[in-house]
Amino acid sequence: MSAPAISYSEDSALSVLLDQEFAPERLAELCPESALDARHWQAALYEPLRGFLARPGKEFRASLVRLGYRIAGGTEELPLALPELVEILHAGSLIIDDIEDDSSSRRGAAALHRQIGLPKALNAGNWLYFWPSRLLQQLSLPATAELSFHRAMNQMLLNCHYGQALDLGATLGEVGRAELEPAVRTLSTLKTGSLMGFAAESGALFAGASPSVVRTLNRFGQELGVGLQMLDDLGGIQSERRAQKGHEDLLNGRLTWVWAWLAEAVDATEFDLLSQMQTQVQARDLHPEVLCAKIRPVLKKHRVRVHLHLDKAFGELTSAVGLAPGVGELRRTLSVLEKSYD
């Protein structure tokens, strides 16, 4: 059973924002001295992104923005663009991620670079990193608040790229058994947790929360991100439906929670055997499913580890802010989301 997904319809917030950005009068501002045909931008940028953003998604990060806002005391309706900023940034990271991994699919369709070619997909993914800055400007925030947003967003983007560099630059054979857990935790916090932390803190920033509340929500979001990465890594091994993801991780020798947990769960002899099989998988001398079958029994109860991690994150949040509105609803949403990793 998969978690319910949100399909970005013609009237979705992302569609509305994208249509506004590519309105004829807006495109005319880019080239005021000539009647350059808007079809060039539409074909290379608008149409591919309209299709990509229309693919089903869960909008969990947007929910985190709303939660942060409510915890910080916000009562008015949020501007249309604010919760979508993180979804836009996330969409950009997915496009770039798929290019770097040469993934074949994303959200039920071909990866964007497989659809429109690498150059256009690369430009589209990068454009999604910068569009939120323009949307922030359009919110007409007080100068100090806008500066805080930009600083938080820039730090998040920097951390995400540090995490991606570690994901691309370090493989299993290069990290010792004792260093696996801290390396995987660092990677997960930077690459996945940073965006979730920004989502949680951005709502609080908009509500004018104190620095301590902003820091608490950022930390909470980071830990949620780490928990979701745990689910993602484990699901790639345990779920038949998500086997392609698990196989891809093994073929690329990625640092995942699977290997961090294996380093704790088995003795040195067994770990060496699994590592040798991993080397064969990376060399394409062994099918990754053979290694998956060897790993599954060892990690069959490790979903409990994920639950303990998430329970701790929610417990720390409650200790800091009390039984704030929206926390229970987010927990229920997360329970449904968890099923998408099965």
Model region roles, listed by residue range:
Residues 1-35:
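N-terminal amphipathic/basic leader segments beginning at the initiator methionine
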Residues 14, 21, 25, 30, ...:
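Amphipathic alpha-helices that form helix-helix packing interfaces
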Residues 17, 48, 294, 298, ...:
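Charge-rich, solvent-exposed alpha-helical interaction surfaces
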Residues 39-271:
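Mg2+-dependent prenyl diphosphate-binding active-site environment of isoprenoid biosynthetic enzymes
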Residues 249-252, 307-310, 327-332:
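Amphipathic alpha-helical protein-interaction segments enriched in hydrophobic
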Residues 273-318:
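Mobile late-domain/C-terminal helix-loop "cap" segments
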Residues 321-342:
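Short, amphipathic C-terminal "tail helix"
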